[in-house]
């Protein structure tokens, strides 16, 4: 054994047994307003947590619009770890505080593409976790950061249009 982890026959570390379930969206998310937007953004965070725990990004990718580069980066980072025999254990993001939640003003060329969108600011907490990328086991410390999600209402449901933040992006690779 290596620490609390069991070695496989090939010398790699076996991932601890976890059986996460694909998160379902809160009923309050099925409305085009501030509450629905916040619940959709929280669902996105739940999907990130599920994807890191399972290695399965299907639900995350389906919830993300093609234009969401942040979503693509997270999905690819998870694939980079899991597709090469690695895993993450204990990694969880939680919203500590909602600092803002507003409809996007689309009166500038930079924001015109965000019709029917809400932008939020979340103060986030990241749990301490272990990430294994053969042959390295890394103990990722707990941390905080800010996530700025933009969710889009397509007329019947929310999708993640874009996101960004400070420290939260680098949390994926610390």
Language model regions located:
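A short, amphipathic edge element
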Residues: 84-107
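A mature extracytoplasmic/lumenal domain signature
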Residues: 64-67, 75, 93, 122-126, ...
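Amphipathic, hydrophobic N-terminal targeting peptides for secretion and organelle import
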Residues: 1-22, 165-168
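Exposed beta-sheet edge and beta->alpha loop/turn motif
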Residues: 102-174
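Core segments of small alpha/beta cavity-forming domains
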Residues: 12-89
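Compositionally biased, low-complexity repeat tracts
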Residues: 7, 96, 139-141
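Short, mixed-charge, low-aromatic patches
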Residues: 1-4, 15-17, 31-34, 102-108
């Amino acid at each position: 054994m290596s620490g609390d982890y069991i070695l496989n026959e090939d010398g790699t570390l076996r991932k601890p047994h976890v059986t996460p379930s694909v998160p379902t969206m809160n009923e309050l998310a099925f409305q085009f307003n501030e509450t629905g937007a916040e619940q959709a953004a929280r669902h996105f965070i739940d999907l990130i947590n599920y994807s890191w725990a399972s290695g399965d990004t299907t639900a995350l990718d389906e919830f993300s619009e093609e234009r969401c580069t942040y979503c693509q980066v997270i999905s690819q980072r998870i694939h980079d770890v899991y597709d090469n025999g690695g895993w993450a254990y204990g990694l969880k993001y939680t919203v500590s505080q909602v600092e803002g939640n507003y409809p996007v003003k689309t009166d500038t060329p930079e924001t015109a593409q965000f019709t029917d969108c809400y932008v939020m600011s979340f103060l986030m907490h990241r749990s301490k976790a272990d990430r294994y990328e053969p042959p390295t086991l890394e103990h990722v410390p707990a941390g905080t950061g800010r996530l700025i999600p933009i969710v889009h209402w397509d007329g019947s449901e929310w999708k993640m249009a874009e996101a960004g933040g400070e420290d939260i992006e680098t949390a994926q690779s610390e």
